[in-house]
């Protein structure tokens, strides 16, 4: 400023400096420019809400709206008469559920089947973790992709087609029995499906075959997010591949595994019914009937929709309590809740 002080205006103009140049002039120039407005958080929130809205509507229609059907638990509901033509019986069906010795004995076996299937699933929940780690260690990318594809595809096969595969292989006239008979190893067909022995383990094996590859996808994504500098530092220190898996990969997958484990504990009564519905028969019905299938059989086969509704209510309430308990345990263990 002192160098230009007292200079003639034409000299300043020749030097490319306007007489009003300086901090004040610059601020005036900037003031005349267009300001960039910060993004509107309200507009962004509305956009995100519109994106989520269809899923909220679907959740409301298929998860919350059916709860209105719980009112049938207080009626002797007859589908042909409708709710208006059915007799109001109050808590009669609740009393039937807890007062009938036969009903309680049957329900006890159903709960034993349900809990056994769930605990077997929890006991084998680490298999997708180990499978993802081993799959990640395959160096040939074409072989890794082929294995991942072949193990993921069964997840997209319906349980009806899975049973068709099982029947064609393991029925009395299936491929396995035919081959063993032709080789002279057996004279009487072996019963793989028409038997009550090892039903829980058989259902577990089919469930693992169908869902192992799909369950490993989330862990493969978690492995891809691990900081590679950890592996590089360990290699510099002389760590082997097994040590990398044991001390880096496996511990880094544990937070994901714990969350999924807590959710599986909360859903311990939700086994689904499709698998058990297609595999059930007169020989294995006692040990294959889980709670979801039992509710279906009571309502549709036994023609007692009101009692089936009572069972569904108990299941929903217990599942909600288990979810809240699992969330509290997760919050205490991890410092943050899962819901």
Name each model-derived stretch:
Residues 44-339:
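A structural signal for multi-pass alpha-helical bundles of membrane permease subunits
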């Amino acid at each position: 400023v002192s160098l230009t002080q007292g200079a003639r205006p034409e000299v300043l103009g020749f030097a490319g400096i306007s007489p009003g140049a300086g901090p004040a002039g610059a601020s005036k120039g900037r003031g005349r420019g267009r300001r960039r407005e910060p993004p509107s958080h309200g507009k962004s929130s509305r956009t995100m809400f519109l994106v989520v809205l269809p899923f909220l509507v679907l959740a409301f229609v298929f998860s919350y709206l059916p709860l209105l059907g719980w009112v049938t638990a207080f009626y002797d509901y007859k589908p042909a008469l409708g709710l208006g033509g059915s007799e109001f019986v109050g808590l009669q069906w609740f009393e039937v559920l807890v007062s009938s010795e036969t009903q309680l004995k049957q329900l006890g076996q159903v709960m034993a089947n349900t809990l056994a299937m769930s605990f077997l699933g929890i006991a084998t929940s680490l298999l997708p973790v180990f499978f993802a780690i081993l799959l990640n260690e395959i160096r040939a990318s074409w072989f890794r992709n082929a294995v991942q594809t072949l193990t993921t595809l069964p997840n997209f096969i319906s349980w009806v087609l899975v049973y068709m595969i099982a029947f064609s292989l393991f029925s009395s006239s299936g491929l396995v029995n035919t081959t063993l008979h032709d080789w002279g190893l057996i004279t009487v067909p072996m019963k793989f499906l028409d038997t009550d022995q090892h039903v829980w383990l058989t259902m577990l094996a089919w469930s693992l075959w169908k869902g192992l590859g799909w369950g490993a996808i989330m862990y493969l994504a978690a492995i891809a997010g691990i900081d590679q500098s950890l592996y590089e530092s360990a290699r510099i220190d002389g760590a082997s591949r097994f040590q990398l898996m044991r001390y880096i990969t496996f511990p880094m997958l544990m937070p994901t595994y714990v969350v999924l484990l807590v959710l599986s504990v909360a859903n311990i009564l939700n086994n689904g019914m499709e698998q058990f519905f297609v595999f059930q028969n007169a020989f294995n019905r006692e040990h294959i009937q889980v709670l979801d299938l039992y509710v279906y059989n009571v309502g549709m086969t036994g023609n007692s929709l009101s009692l089936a509704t009572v069972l569904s209510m108990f299941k929903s309430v217990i599942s909600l309590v288990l979810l809240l308990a699992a969330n509290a345990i997760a919050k205490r263990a991890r410092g943050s809740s899962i819901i």
